[in-house]
């Protein structure tokens, strides 16, 4: 194994590099370099879609490089070897007292596709290549670990453990396939992969029985999931697979787009250290740093992956947002520093605001935010109320305000509100049918074409925000973390009947403050 690790390391595979091997008492020791980082399996769901897919691409490309190491010429013919292995697994499955519902579909698929093994090449295999044997080091680079099950065989058989990758992150699994084949996946691959996964799945329950009923249940659920992916083994392309999206790197950071775009103009604002590319507005946002100062750049004009409409429409919407940030300048609103027609589009430049986002699209940040002490969340809500009251006084109605608009700086205790692009001046009428925004925070009138949108609409938004902050997004008394009076106040605000809500933000604030004075802190 040590020699094979040396060979892999010589190809530039990111891994624990072999340093030394020698005898130790009655055994053998090996010395390898240390990788300081996180298990990818543990953090993958906390990463953005872009990062998940990008790491999948990396994993596929690394595997392709690993497979450039040939198998020994003396290696047994693959067709004979793997047919023997499948026969053994089928026999063990039939002898096993526990069978899968629909398990015969795996056997039928194997028997109908054995011919695919004929003439398959053989190469060095990692032997256990999946997300559980990958790490992200402190520099953000993918690292491969645990080579102790290495083997030689069909390079495509190495994908048989992609089941575990797909269960954790379909985007990562898709990226792994696309990266390996450079985006051009041959149809034969899917047929063979289904064969290899069928073989692996058959052996899972016999393997699990010695480990107890809990492990057996895991394998039964996994088999059912595999059958659902492959439509009972009738479709060789699993349902989790995605062709992905175009990835472009800016200062070493990936972003997803519909196609290439020239972002060289960003260097006017320094080096990019963060990218936000999941907006459906058509905007793409960047954190940049120049001469020790940080900026938040919101840009319209690029072909963003999730954007609806054309880049030109996104530019027009962002241009409309410019006076909103100027008119609603407030101590808790992200500070606009300027705007510029640049790069074939429009950039709004803000001073950078540190903080964790409450939005559930950022799982790690969201969890940290929601673990804030009750007193801190109450302070955040006071800041939001202050901004909403100011918004109403300036003659605006808040459209598309949601948890993703709220940042909290754990160092300073400061609340920052951002992403108010769709706020509108009153009088305002619903001219879309379904207005921009998250349905969790939208009033009924924001779904009714021609309905009036006003301060009473924003009372609903404030009530929904209260339930997000103090009721775990639910609207039942059981989840509410404050007292009965404040619950009644918030419930009144989210009434479907506009006439039953508080009729102004000020009225809500006064009722809210009065309720808190009558309630003991938990």
Question: For the regions a protein language model found, what residue spans apply to each?
Answer:
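Conserved protein kinase catalytic/activation segment
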Residues: 134-143, 405-419
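Helix-rich C-terminal or lid/interface subdomains of diverse kinases
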Residues: 53, 57, 118, 161-241, ...
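An alpha-helical support segment within catalytic cores of ATP-dependent transferases
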Residues: 23, 57, 64-127, 178, ...
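Active-site Asp-x-Gly
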Residues: 122-124, 137-190, 420-447, 451-459
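ATP-binding glycine-rich loop module of kinase domains
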Residues: 1, 273-275, 281-323
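Juxta-kinase regulatory segment immediately upstream of eukaryotic protein kinase catalytic domains
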Residues: 240-274
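ATP-binding pocket architecture of kinase catalytic cores
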Residues: 1-77, 339-342, 346-351, 356-361, ...
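Catalytic-loop of the protein kinase fold
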Residues: 124-126, 131, 388, 392-409
């Amino acid at each position: 194994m040590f020699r094979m690790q040396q060979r892999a390391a010589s190809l530039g595979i990111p891994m624990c590099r072999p340093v030394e091997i020698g005898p130790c008492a009655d055994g053998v020791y090996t010395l390898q370099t240390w990788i300081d980082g996180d298990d990818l399996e543990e953090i993958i769901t906390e990463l953005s879609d872009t990062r998940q897919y990008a790491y999948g691409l990396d994993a596929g490309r690394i595997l392709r490089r690993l497979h450039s190491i040939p198998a020994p010429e003396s290696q047994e013919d693959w067709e004979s070897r793997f047919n023997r292995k499948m026969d053994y697994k089928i026999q063990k499955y039939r002898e096993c007292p526990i069978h899968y519902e629909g398990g015969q579909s795996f056997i039928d698929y194997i028997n109908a596709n054995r011919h695919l093994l004929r003439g398959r090449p053989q190469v060095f295999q990692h032997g256990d290549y999946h997300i559980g044997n990958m790490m992200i080091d402190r520099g953000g680079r993918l690292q491969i670990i645990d080579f102790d099950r290495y083997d030689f065989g069909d390079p495509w058989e190495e994908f048989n453990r992609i089941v575990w990758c797909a269960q954790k992150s379909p985007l990562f699994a898709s990226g792994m396939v696309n990266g390996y084949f450079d985006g051009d996946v041959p149809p034969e691959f899917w047929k063979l992969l289904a064969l290899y996964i069928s073989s692996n799945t058959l052996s899972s329950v016999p393997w699990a029985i010695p480990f107890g009923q809990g492990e057996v249940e895991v394998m039964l659920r996994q088999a059912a999931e595999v059958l659902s992916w492959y439509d009972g083994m009738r479709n060789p392309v699993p349902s989790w697979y995605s062709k992905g999206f175009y990835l472009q790197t800016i200062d070493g950071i990936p972003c997803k787009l519909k196609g290439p775009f020239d972002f060289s103009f960003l260097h006017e604002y320094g080096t990019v250290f963060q990218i936000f590319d999941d907006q459906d507005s058509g905007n793409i946002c960047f954190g940049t740093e120049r001469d020790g100062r940080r900026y938040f750049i919101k840009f319209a004009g690029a072909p963003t992956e999730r954007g609806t409409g054309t880049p030109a429409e996104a530019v027009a919407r962002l241009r409309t947002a410019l006076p909103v940030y100027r008119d609603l300048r407030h101590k808790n609103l992200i500070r606009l520093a300027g705007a510029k027609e640049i790069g074939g589009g429009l950039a709004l430049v803000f001073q950078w605001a540190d903080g964790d986002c409450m939005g559930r699209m950022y799982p790690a940040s969201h969890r940290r935010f929601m673990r804030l002490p009750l007193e801190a969340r109450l302070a955040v809500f006071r800041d939001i109320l202050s901004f909403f009251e100011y918004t109403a006084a300036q003659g605006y109605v808040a459209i598309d305000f949601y948890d993703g608009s709220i940042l909290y700086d754990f160092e300073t205790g400061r609340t920052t509100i951002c992403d108010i692009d769709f706020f509108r001046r009153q009088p305002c009428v619903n001219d879309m049918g379904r207005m921009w925004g998250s349905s969790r925070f939208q009033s009924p009138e924001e779904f009714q074409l021609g309905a009036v949108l006003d301060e009473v609409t924003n009372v609903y938004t404030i009530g929904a925000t209260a339930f997000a902050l103090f009721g775990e997004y639910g609207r039942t008394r059981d989840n509410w973390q404050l007292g009965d009076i404040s619950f009644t106040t918030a419930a009144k605000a989210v009434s479907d009947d506009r006439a039953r809500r508080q009729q102004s933000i000020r009225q809500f604030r006064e009722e809210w403050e009065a309720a808190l004075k009558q309630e003991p802190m938990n």
